[in-house]
Structure formats: structure tokens, C-alpha cells
Amino acid sequence: MDNRKRLAYAIIQFLHGQLRHGGLSSDAQESLEVAIQCLETAFGVTLEDSDLALPQTLPEIFEAATASKEMPQDPRGPDRTPPSEEDSAEAERLKTEGNEQMKLENFEAAVHLYGKAIELNPANAVYFCNRAAAYSKLGNYVGAVQDCERAIGIDPGYSKAYGRMGLALSSLNKHAEAVAYYKKALELDPDNDTYKSNLKIAELKLREAPSPTGGVGSLDIAGLLNNPHFITMASSLMNSPQLQQLMSGMISGGHNPLGTPGSSPQHSDLASLIQAGQQFAQQMQQQNPEFVEQIRSQVVRSRTPSASHEEQQE
């Protein structure tokens, strides 16, 4: 049977599917209908010719072809021909150029250069790991995860690949998986402070999911303001004669009731305000240390994992 008819049928089938589920505008739908009619006329096939149907739809065929291109055979496999000296040298040059583009924050260019290096030497874990860092900078965390998987597959002892995998998974809010990869990174590089810090953050995020009513950086402002301990201590602070005297002086136009002779009003007011805040913090710590620890945990949880160490490309 003519494969051209099979291909035409697959395209017509795909276009019909887009008409049903594509969410297209009326103009786009009309254009697809015209395209379908043209294909049916040109190749003499219609959607009713089910004998022309392939085992897979066109999108499935495309997805499989794309996956096979992105995931070539195992670079460590026995059938893989090692790169020539010239290819290895060129791959290193491309990697170095990619590193320079990373420093210039030209992340798309870096992805392209690392990809070229991978084409020449797909058995080098560093190239995949570096491209993962570039993908993360572009917000393509799924791509970063895939490249880290490739790097780990090539070199299971490569700690940086586990660390970058943890960063990408954290960005995807997959904190349980991120914790596992950070632990593996620390197992391979136990003195790495970045891995330790990122592991702590991921563990906190895993234990305490961010509140949907939380404020900036997932700090639960709404919960804080509704906490009776916080309200009681805040009321005590606002009723403090020292704070009331300070605020009265500031409102009256710079009068410095708490200042010392010869000190500037602005400096003394600021110092007094800081002093009042410190007293409030001390009072909170003494009266409800568990609540203070809860606030501290929320602040730590609101931080994002650091990529400072990971930005150093090899």
C-alpha cells in the first residue's frame, strides 16, 4: 500500500483531532477544514478509510522520534565508537565557550554550545551537567532533570550532577526527591556547604508545605496575624510608654523626647525604635520560645536553594 496515502491519512486524522480538541479560533478551524479538504482531494483518502490507519497516531510517532533523538544509545555501551582526538578537543573547546557564555548570562547560547559538545562526545558527564545548569537558568527544570539523569548514568560518582538534580527538583517542588539527591551529593562530597544548606532547606519545605495564604516567599503572614500569642505581645509593645513617647515625638515633627543632648533627632529616633524592637523580640523569646522558633522556621523555609557553588562550570 502506498505509504504516501498512509501519511496523508495520519495527517488528516491529526487535523481532525485538532478540530475536536484544539481550542482553536473560528478562523483557525476554517483553515484546518480547508487543509483537510485539500489533502483528501490530492491523495484520494478520507477519515473513513480506516484501513490506512497506523498503529500509532502522528503525535505518538513524532514523540517517539523526538525521544529517540534526545535519548541516544547509552554512551558507555560497547557499540559506541569513542570520539577521535580531534572531536574530543573540539568538544572541550565548545564546552569552554559555553562556560564563558554562562558567565555572560547568555544561557541560550550556552545550551547550544554544550549541545554541540555532547554531539561530539556524548560520553562526557560534565557536558550534560553543565547544560543542566544552563537549562535551570532558563527555567527549563524538566530539561535540567533529564540532563542530570544522563550525567549520573554516565558517571554515578559525579557529586555535582546530584546537587544540580536537587536544585532542579526543588524548583519543581519535588522536595522529597530533592532531599534524596542532596543526600547522595553530600555522601560523595561531605564537606560541601552548599549541599548542606540546600538539604536543610529542602527538608524544611518537605516537612511544612507553604500556606496558600502566606505572604512573600511563603512566610505565613495571615497565620502570624491570627496567632493569639503574637497579638498579645504586639498589644503589649504598642502600649509601651517608651514606644508611645517615641511615636509622639516623631509625629510632632522631629522632637526628640528620648534622645541624648547633642544627638541628631533622626539617629536617636532610629536607635530608640531599634531598641523597642529588640525588647519586643526578647519578650517574645521569653514568653513563647516555641512561637519564635515557628517564625524562624518559616523564614528559613521561604528561602530558595542556593546555586552559588553549582554555578562554577567545569
UniProtKB/Swiss-Prot annotation:
InterPro entries: SGT, SGTA_dimer, TPR-like_helical_dom_sf, TPR_rpt
Region ranges (Disordered): 65-99, 249-268
Short name of any one Pfam family annotated for the protein: TPR_8
Cited PROSITE patterns: TPR, TPR_REGION
Family, as annotated: Belongs to the SGT family.
Subunit relationships: Homodimer. Homooligomer. Interacts with DNAJC5 and DNAJC5B. Interacts (via TPR repeats) with HSP90AA1. Interacts (via Gln-rich region) with SLC2A1. Interacts with HSP90AB1. Interacts (via TPR repeats) with HSPA8/Hsc70; the interaction is direct. Interacts with BAG6 (via ubiquitin-like domain); interaction prevents interaction between BAG6 and RNF126. Forms a multiprotein complex, at least composed of DNAJB12, DNAJB14, HSPA8/Hsc70 and SGTA; interaction with DNAJB14 and HSPA8/Hsc70 is direct.
Name assigned to this protein: Small glutamine-rich tetratricopeptide repeat-containing protein alpha
Gene: Sgta
